[in-house]
Amino acid sequence: MVDVIKNTQIHCTYGCKSSKAVQPDVAGKMISKAKRPLFIVGSQILKDEELLKRSIEIAKKADLPVAATGHSMSGLVDQGVNAKYINVHALATYLCDPNWTGLDGKGQYDTIIVLGHFKYYIDQVLSGLKSFSKLKSIAIEREYIQNATMSFGNITPAVHIEALDELIDNL
């Protein structure tokens, strides 16, 4: 078992709602139990072939709808993933709207899973979602994402791949 929450320190002032550190097996089970999940993939998956491979495996094994942000669309389409392109800021605005019917028109999402984004970028996007929506967010990034509902801790690239493998095994 990969311990991705070891040595994770959460610093916040009084009243701050911060992300809970989560183990990969728990994250995998939560994704499986979500009624209407959305996998939001960023362009950083293209910088590492192993990360791209794991993101495709997660999407296919859990049968997740995929929102491709940045230029991540190219890597996903080449591998046969049915992804929809959308700007991450526009997506965050839509996700806060209770009347939005989703990328496929089947209704609002209840859980989002994020992978392949810059920490400083996705943390700000999730800040808005945390404050203005009831969505659960699971950050399976290499860095701890403070504004997600749950997040992996700060881990090395090798441990991150191991954690994603464990998550995939629990989908």
UniProtKB/Swiss-Prot annotation:
Q: What is this protein called?
A: Acetyl-CoA decarbonylase/synthase complex subunit epsilon
Task: State the source organism's domain of life.
Answer: Archaea
**Homology family:** Belongs to the CdhB family.
What are the entry keywords? Methanogenesis
Q: Which GO terms describe its biological process?
A: methanogenesis, from acetate
* Purpose: Part of a complex that catalyzes the reversible cleavage of acetyl-CoA, allowing growth on acetate as sole source of carbon and energy. The alpha-epsilon subcomponent functions as a carbon monoxide dehydrogenase. The precise role of the epsilon subunit is unclear; it may have a stabilizing role within the alpha(2)epsilon(2) component and/or be involved in electron transfer to FAD during a potential FAD-mediated CO oxidation.
- The organism is Methanococcoides burtonii (strain DSM 6242 / NBRC 107633 / OCM 468 / ACE-M)
The cross-references to InterPro entries, in alphabetical order and at most eight, read: CdhB, DHS-like_NAD/FAD-binding_dom
Describe, as the record does, how this protein assembles with itself and its partners: Heterotetramer of two alpha and two epsilon subunits. The ACDS complex is made up of alpha, epsilon, beta, gamma and delta subunits with a probable stoichiometry of (alpha(2)epsilon(2))(4)-beta(8)-(gamma(1)delta(1))(8).
Its UniProt pathway annotation is:
One-carbon metabolism; methanogenesis from acetate
Q: From which residue to which does any coiled coil extend?
A: none
The record's listing under HAMAP family reads: CdhB
